[in-house]
UniProtKB/Swiss-Prot annotation:
Keyword Ribonucleoprotein part of the UniProt annotation: yes
Name of the molecule in the record: Large ribosomal subunit protein bL28
HAMAP family in the cross-refs: Ribosomal_bL28
Keywords, sorted A to Z: Ribonucleoprotein, Ribosomal protein
Length: 78
């Protein structure tokens, strides 16, 4: 399973760990992914999405119906 948000498309980023001596080693910044169930009133069912914390706030703001319509327009099966 990919570490990618289904709503925002956010995935891992690459950066550096930097020590006090300014030595740099590669590291990955992983998105804050949560597996969440959302109740879709119009379809009378639960939808499980793997989303970031930012996407949860987006769903709270715009509504699950608008977000699902956007996902379906992109061709994702939900």
């Amino acid at each position: 399973m990919a570490r990618v948000c289904q709503v925002t498309g956010k995935g891992p980023m690459v950066g550096n760990n930097v020590s006090h001596a300014n030595n740099k080693t590669k590291r990955r910044f992983l998105p804050n992914l949560q597996s969440r169930r959302f109740w879709v009133e119009s379809e009378n069912r639960w939808v499980r999405l793997r989303v970031t914390a930012k996407a949860i706030r987006t769903i709270d703001k715009n509504g699950i119906d608008a977000v699902l319509a956007d996902l379906r327009a992109r061709g994702e099966a939900v």
